[in-house]
Structures are given as structure tokens and as C-alpha cells.
Amino acid sequence: LKHAPAIIILVIHFLIFAIVNQFLNPHPDMLDHWVWSRYLSLSYYEHPPMIAWLIRGITLIGGNTETALEVGSQLLTISIIALTYAGTFRLYGTKAALVTLLILCSMPYFTLGSIFLHITQPFLIFWVAALFLLIRFHQQPEKKWLLWIGIAAGLGALSKYIMLLFYLGLFIHLLLYRKTRKEILNPWLYAAGIISLAIFVPVLLWNAQHDWISFRWQLGKGTSGADFGENTLAFTLGHLLLFSPLWALMGGLGSGG
């Protein structure tokens, strides 16, 4: 019963935004990806294929309806929050995990951002999973955790290209963390990378057949153009607000006043 409060919070969160969804028009991005799911491919011009594959699976199970996608979106959001809760509980115990859960449930990303399916949801599931698997490896340095990291990172890369930066962060982390610096030479770390690469092969094959258009578009979008860097401040502030728990704090202060 020690997880009962967390389960209640997650159920309430799900019900609130599942109901809110019924009064909103579907988001254009979700509709775009819904179209992708009707024409399955190894990858797509804008993004890797996970979101399209996921939507196809959801519609096969729940029907080809907006409601099925909206419920699927809520379940993905709940999965991210629950996974983070579980990892925090394992590391720091019930109190810290519950506080983490409440903070996540107060963030606009996990409230308003849960009303439509988008590519970041599966990406975050695999990123969080890979992160906690890395922590588990530090606690219990067995090769199986590295291999699971390889699977999680590969699936994350099938969801969003930025997951490829996980390995960059991992190597920097190992170099800076003296106790695990020797793991740079661990062959199982590179086996994990090979697993990730194998999972990512569909994207590579599709891009090879299409003149690497997706990679070229992503790189061009981020590093070129007359307005490059122009909106950096707005982008940064926007994301800080999107992932900020200040909304809950402001609400608490308001109700207290």
C-alpha cells in the first residue's frame, strides 16, 4: 500500500486530462503523425518512425479514432511519470519519489502537453529508462545493464534523433566520474552501442535510399538560416516554463493567500 498515494495521483491525472481532451480539437502534429501511421515506413522525412508505428499500434487496439489516440497519449504521459517515480523510489525512497511525482504532475509539459500524441513521449520513456539503467549499472556493475541501455537508447533513437546524444553524455559522464572512468574500456559498453545501432538500422536504410534527406534537413534546420540563434532566448525560456513546477507553487501561494 505504500504506493497507493502515487497510484491515486496518477489515476486522477489521467482522468482529468482524458476528460479535458474531449473538449479540445486534435492537435495538428498528432493529425500529421496519424497520417504517417497509415503509410508505414522505415523512417520519415521529419522524424524517425516510432511515433507512426506507435499510433498504428494504438489504432489497431483501440480503433481508428481520436479518442483512442487521446487515451494513448495519456497512457504514454502516465508511463513517463510512473517510470520516473519508480526510479526515484529505488534511489531515494517513498517521500522523494512522491515529491518528484507531484512536481512532474504540475509541469505544463505533463499536463497540457499530455493532450496529444507527439514524438517526445516515447523518446522520454526510453531516455528515462536508459538513465535509470545507467544508475543501476553504477550500483551493480553487470554487463546486462549495459545491454539494456543499448536497447533503450536504440529505441529512443527510433523515437527522436536527439537520443543519439545520450551516448555522448554517457562518455562525458564516464570520463568525469573517476570511479567509473575505467568503464570506457569495458567491451560491453561498445556492445551496447552496437545493439543501439542495430535497432537504428531502419532509419539508416531509409535515409540511404533517400539521399540522407532527414539528416540533412535536421542539421540544416538547427545550424543554418538567417534567423539562426535569433530565437534562442525565447526557446530557452519557453522550455524552462514548459518543464517548470512553478505553476504548482504559484497555485499554492494563491490558495494560501
For every predicted segment, state its role.
Residues 20-33, 42-54, 63-67:
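Extracytoplasmic catalytic/substrate-binding loops of multi-pass membrane glycan-assembly enzymes
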Residues 7, 71-92, 129-133:
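Transmembrane-helix motifs of polytopic, lipid-linked glycan transferases
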Residues 38, 122-139, 145-153:
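Specific aromatic-rich, kink-prone transmembrane helix
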Residues 9-10, 100-105, 153, 157:
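Short helix- or helix-capping micro-motifs
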Residues 90-95, 130-145, 253-257:
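Membrane-interface transmembrane helices that cradle and orient dolichyl/undecaprenyl
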Residues 3, 84-106, 125:
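Transmembrane-helix signature of polytopic, membrane-embedded enzymes
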Residues 166-257:
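Transmembrane-lumen/periplasm boundary regions of multi-pass, lipid-linked membrane glycan transferases
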Residues 28, 109-123:
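Short acidic/glycine- and proline-prone juxtamembrane loop motifs at membrane-interface regions
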